[in-house]
Every structure is written in structure tokens, then in C-alpha cells.
């Protein structure tokens, strides 16, 4: 007769805390593993999987009261023509620039916020 995983879990759930600690210690010795070691290695792997973001998008949420200044700033930042920059700004909420460095994104955000736009970096 084979014992199922559910039966093992049910038996463990009925044990006292001290008996569970003894069981863990016995399993560590029998299989040559350490419960604390696996926890640390899992945390290390999670840190490796999380990459630091290097490219950002500038998202125009709200134009603000100074539409002309926002259009001029967007035009100079994107290299678009006047009509294209105006159309882009008027389509807010929208992405203004994609895949730019963190420094460039923060600089553009500050410039646009200074002229009254509401900006989000994603």
C-alpha cells in the first residue's frame, strides 16, 4: 500500500510543533539537505530573476493648462513636426517616448511637469 501526499500532510498537520521540528531534522539527516539552505537559495534565485529595468517609457497622462508649452517640449524631445507633436499631445493619455534611459526619462518628466503636464514613467 502506498501513502499519498495528502495522507502525509494530514498526519503532519496533526503533529505537535516539536514533533514537526524533529521530523524536519530527521529528513535533513536522511536526505542530506538543509531546509534553511534551500530557503536562502530560493531568495537568491528570485533576486537573479528580477532584472533592473534600463529602458523606460514616458506616458503623458494630462496635458495641463499650458498646452502650447507642452507641445513645444514634446516637439523638441521627440523630433516630431509641429502637427505631429500637437496630435500626439492632444491624444493624451498616451506614450510620448519609448525605451529611453532612466536619466533621460527623469529629465523629460521634469521638463514636462515644469510646463504643467502630468507625466508618468513606466
From Swiss-Prot:
Keywords: Ribonucleoprotein, Ribosomal protein. It holds the Pfam family Ribosomal_L12_N. Homodimer. Part of the ribosomal stalk of the 50S ribosomal subunit. Forms a multimeric L10(L12)X complex, where L10 forms an elongated spine to which 2 to 4 L12 dimers bind in a sequential fashion. Binds GTP-bound translation factors. The keyword Ribosomal protein applies. It comes from Buchnera aphidicola subsp. Acyrthosiphon pisum (strain APS) (Acyrthosiphon pisum symbiotic bacterium). Belongs to the bacterial ribosomal protein bL12 family. InterPro entries: Ribosomal_bL12, Ribosomal_bL12_C, Ribosomal_bL12_C/ClpS-like, Ribosomal_bL12_oligo, Ribosomal_bL12_oligo_N_sf. One of its GO terms (molecular function) is mRNA binding. NCBIfam families: L12. The gene is rplL. Forms part of the ribosomal stalk which helps the ribosome interact with GTP-bound translation factors. Is thus essential for accurate translation. Gene3D superfamilies: 3.30.1390.10, Single helix bin. It comes from the Bacteria. HAMAP family: Ribosomal_bL12 (MF_00368). Disulfide bonds: none annotated. This is Large ribosomal subunit protein bL12. SUPFAM superfamilies: ClpS-like, Ribosomal protein L7/12, oligomerisation (N-terminal) domain. GO terms for biological process: translation. GO terms for cellular component: cytosolic large ribosomal subunit.
